[in-house]
Amino acid sequence: MVSTLDSQARAQQFRRDQDRQGSRTDQQMRRSTFTDGAVTYGAVGGTQAADLLYYPPAGYRPLERTVRLGSGPERFETAVAALMTWGVQRRSGFEVTDVHEGTGEHYTGIAYDDQGTPLGLQERAEREAVFAEDGSPYISNGMTAVLKVPVGPFTLSAPVRVVYVVDEPTRIGYAYGSRAHHPVSGEEAFFVELHPDGAVTFTIRRFSRPATRMGRLFGPVVRWQQRRITTRYLRALLPARSA
């Protein structure tokens, strides 16, 4: 029990240190070029934390949802191709505009042991450009875009920056963070995974909060809209949508 409490205490202290490191990372990003775009929060890469749902960045609401997409390597590859070319957003009714590659700067994330204790920052790995069969470039580190989100009779602009990409043999995905003028502040991550039993799953993780005073006043409405969008996201890679 003492060992478990010590591990949790170390994790919380590391998270506080990481929040401070995230603030420094954010400041570095803010010194980047206009093309790169600056994120509007400090805990960059926080969606990789194993204990996100229990210890989210202060003031933010966490979320994690997973849906099964089917099974087998072919289903995995099909889902990955859609995920990494903005398929989740487009199939959810969004328009993806103003896409720029950026410089490739990214947050490398935190490494954890089997008990969830943080070990430190992961080593940074360079990733070659990847393209889909139709020539569409895969989402890459530092890429920026503006999502056009339909909300009733209105369309909201949501500028984002890709802060990291996960490229493992059986787990692929990315996360983007909010930029200036995004209606919410925070980070959202999307992963497709091929499990040892052959199952293919799609997971969404995020932490967020309204970015404006008006948004905070209408917090329940904002969260309701986010739930609707999350439901669309989870359906976007289902086989029926991919056909």
Predicted regions and their residues:
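Hydrophobic-ligand binding "helix-grip"
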Residues: 148-196
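Short, solvent-exposed aromatic-acidic interface loops
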Residues: 178-182, 205-212
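A short hydrophobic beta-strand element
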Residues: 141-143, 170-176, 202-205
